[in-house]
Amino acid sequence: MNVYAAIDLMSGKVVRLKEGKAENITVYSENPLTVIRRLYDEGFERFHIVDLDAALGIGDNFNIISEMLKEKGYKQVAGGIRDVQKIKKYIDSGADRVVLSTLAFVNPQSLLPMKDKITISLDVKDEIVSYEGWKKDSGLKLNEALSKFSEMGFEEFIVTSINRDGTMKGFDRKIAQSIPFEYRKKVLLSGGVLLNEIKEIEMLGYKGCIIGKDLYEKYFGDA
């Protein structure tokens, strides 16, 4: 199973937001390169790098992310990537995959030529998928979205429980149990995931998971 360490960036710093709210921010490090190197040394080989400034439309962290992409490990980049040019820019800079939400709902056809490099992020609250920084309602239930994008040929998804994100309450078992087995091998679970839940998620048949706050409390809790 693929376990990703989340590295969320805001103003060039490594942070975590609770439930995606900018006012609920914890800064863990002012040096993202130190963080990715430390996590790699601790045994994490996959990284989920999120540009929160770009996601919120208040700036971007492209320069530091491009430096992080030169480090060891498998890296996927997310956050505010809403046009094909930016996708290509990240891939050209060394990203193994690019994670999208808004563009997948607004213009999915534009992504088909690059679908092997695309992971679609499905952010869920009250059974409905949201996009554009969790501000817009897609009108689709989770399994409807998984079916729609799978039929188009997309092979990897991140399913995030918005209410669990950054809470350390554990992954959302209701959501996890609701996803048909045929899709689980394509899905990375996210939102509240704890280090001690990795084996359980693997036993449920999921492709992987993304761990954020629990990771930082363990390795960077004295920040």
Predicted region positions:
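Conserved anion-binding
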Residues: 10-23, 95-165
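Glycine-rich, proline-tolerant flexible connector loops at the mouths of alpha/beta enzymes
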Residues: 46-60, 64, 158-169
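Structural preference for beta-strand elements that scaffold enzyme active sites
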Residues: 2-6, 46, 74-78, 96-99, ...
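N-terminal beta-alpha supersecondary unit
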Residues: 14-59
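Short, acidic/polar
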Residues: 28-40, 83-89, 137-148, 198
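Structural motif
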Residues: 42, 93-94, 152, 182, ...
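Glycine-rich phosphate-binding active-site loops on the catalytic face of alpha/beta enzymes
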Residues: 86-110, 158-166, 190-223
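Alpha-helix-loop-beta-strand connector modules within alpha/beta enzyme cores
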Residues: 5, 57-79, 110-124, 170-195
